[in-house]
């Protein structure tokens, strides 16, 4: 009897467990190279960068957040000036050290301009994440 209940429970839960990877894939709102970010990841990174910008503080040897000049000519839907801030594939908020390849770009009004990456770009340029 107990074995039968356990088998039934396992049979019911197994399809749900197998479906979980597809749920994770659907949470990918931005793809930068092979890195996947949810809107929540982007919002968290943006909030951290904007708070430092507002406080007049920076972190890391490249002094993030710093002005982003948009030399690539991206057609952002929000007005400049723009600032760039690292978004880390680990999910951690950047606090110094290697910034990785990916950035959130926001403006003076804390509006998200876009998510960009050095991955797949030539030299020190950026390409837009999809």
From Swiss-Prot:
Family matches, as Gene3D superfamilies: Microbial ribonucleases
Check the record and name the InterPro entries matching this protein: N1-like, Ribonuclease/ribotoxin, Ribonuclease_N1/T1, RNase_U2
EC number(s)? 4.6.1.24
Q: Give the signal peptide as a residue range, or say none if absent.
A: 1-26
- Which cysteines pair up through disulfides? They are 28-36, 32-129
Q: Which Pfam families match?
A: Ribonuclease
* Active-site residues per Swiss-Prot or TrEMBL entry: 66, 84 (proton acceptor), 118 (proton donor)
Highest taxon of source: Eukaryota
Keywords attached to this entry? Disulfide bond, Endonuclease, Hydrolase, Lyase, Nuclease, Signal
What GO molecular function annotations does the UniProt record carry, in alphabetical order? lyase activity; ribonuclease T1 activity; RNA binding; RNA endonuclease activity
The main enzyme category here is lyase
Q: Which GO terms describe its cellular component?
A: cell septum; hyphal tip
Q: Which reaction does it catalyse?
A: [RNA] containing guanosine + H2O = an [RNA fragment]-3'-guanosine-3'-phosphate + a 5'-hydroxy-ribonucleotide-3'-[RNA fragment]
Q: Which SUPFAM superfamilies match?
A: Microbial ribonucleases
Q: Which CDD domains match?
A: fungal_RNase
Q: Which family does it belong to?
A: Belongs to the ribonuclease N1/T1 family.
| The protein's assembly and partners | Monomer.
Protein name (record): Guanyl-specific ribonuclease T1
The organism named in the record is: Aspergillus oryzae (strain ATCC 42149 / RIB 40)
